[in-house]
Amino acid sequence: MAETIKVRALPQAHCKDCSLAPLCLPLSLTVEDMDSLDEIVKRGRPLKKGEFLFRQGDPFGSVFAVRSGALKTFSITDAGEEQITGFHLPSELVGLSGMDTETYPVSAQALETTSVCEIPFERLDELSEQLPQLRRQLMRLMSREIRDDQQMMLLLSKKTADERIATFLVNLSARFRARGFSAQQFRLAMSRNEIGNYLGLAVETVSRVFTRFQQNGLISAEGKEVHILDSIELCALAGGQLEG
């Protein structure tokens, strides 16, 4: 059975040397500010696929920035079923939703070998009082979570299966591009079943849509490798949503 992982401090790249810093941190932070932040960040051993970073109901104490790999967050419904609420890529924060109730409302599990930076929230909150630009960054991140939730509600309420999957692929493409990776060719860390769970679609529907997209020349896909062949048409099908 997968276990919740406690992140233990190990020597790793510092914030100011991290290639993800421009995405993860406000650009206005000075080297001295980054050093202050670096002092509170814990960096542990990588999580293996299937290991938990935290579980639904665990006491809230830290937020986590993904350094490499990918995580999924999910909640368990009253019927005991898993409902995926998000996929998280390098530079993205996980765990902020625990601030309200002081427990994590979702579980976070590694989709592949994944490294994270653990940031104890109390110390982050104290530091953000000294660094207004850091507090603004936290507010931006919380705003993005609200926006993502709103977009997801719209996605599930109004879009067809083709539109949902097109939106999902365009969103991933934009997020990979922002991280300096190819926007046209990337590997999906999640399974077709997990994509279906997230988008409210049966796995058979997901497979049929991927096949149809390939037949129509929108993408090519082999296993988890995806190559977007017609980004303009895919974006049009997604309703023109290019933002990650």
From Swiss-Prot:
Domain named HTH crp-type: residues: 159-232
SUPFAM superfamilies in UniProt: cAMP-binding domain-like, Winged helix' DNA-binding domain
InterPro entries from the UniProt entry: cNMP-bd_dom, cNMP-bd_dom_sf, Env_Response_Regulators, HTH_CRP, RmlC-like_jellyroll, Tscrpt_reg_HTH_Crp-type_CS, WH-like_DNA-bd_sf, WH_DNA-bd_sf
Gene Ontology BP terms: cellular response to decreased oxygen levels; cyanide biosynthetic process; regulation of arginine catabolic process; regulation of DNA-templated transcription; response to decreased oxygen levels
Transmembrane segments: none
This protein's record includes keyword rRNA processing: no
Gene Ontology molecular function: DNA binding; DNA-binding transcription factor activity
GO cellular component, one term: cytosol
Keywords per UniProt: Activator, DNA-binding, Iron, Transcription, Transcription regulation
DNA-binding stretch(es), residue numbering of this chain: 192-211
A Pfam family that the UniProt record links to this protein: cNMP_binding
Claim: Transcription is one of the keywords in the record: yes
Binding site for a nucleoside 3',5'-cyclic phosphate: 21-149
Function: Transcriptional activator of anaerobic gene expression.
Misc. remarks from the entry: Possesses 4 cysteines which may bind a metal ion (possibly iron).
Protein name per Swiss-Prot or TrEMBL: Transcriptional activator protein anr
Name of the gene encoding the protein in the UniProt record: anr
